[in-house]
């Protein structure tokens, strides 16, 4: 019963995605192009966040530690 409910939930989510993104009115080749472009954009955003967010967090930590006067013995 739980597996059926999960399957129905994912079907509902996919249906909502199709309605919101207007994929329901596209032809199959248009839908595949749209999904490919969307997946590529999402992958690039996730990769960029994975690469650059830790750098920005470190720089913000250094900036605020200098302002607040916190000096770590581990830092250079």
UniProtKB/Swiss-Prot annotation:
Q: Does the keyword Phosphoprotein apply?
A: no
The reply on keyword Transmembrane helix is yes
What causes induction of this gene? Answer: Expression is suppressed by androgens in the androgen-sensitive LNCaP cell line.
Q: One Pfam family for this entry, by name? A: SPT_ssu-like
Which keywords does this chain's UniProt record carry?
Endoplasmic reticulum, Lipid metabolism, Membrane, Sphingolipid metabolism, Transmembrane, Transmembrane helix
Which GO terms fall under molecular function for this chain's record? Answer: serine C-palmitoyltransferase activity
Q: Which domain of life is it from?
A: Eukaryota
State what protein this is by name: Serine palmitoyltransferase small subunit B
Supply the source organism's classification. Eukaryota, Metazoa, Chordata, Craniata, Vertebrata
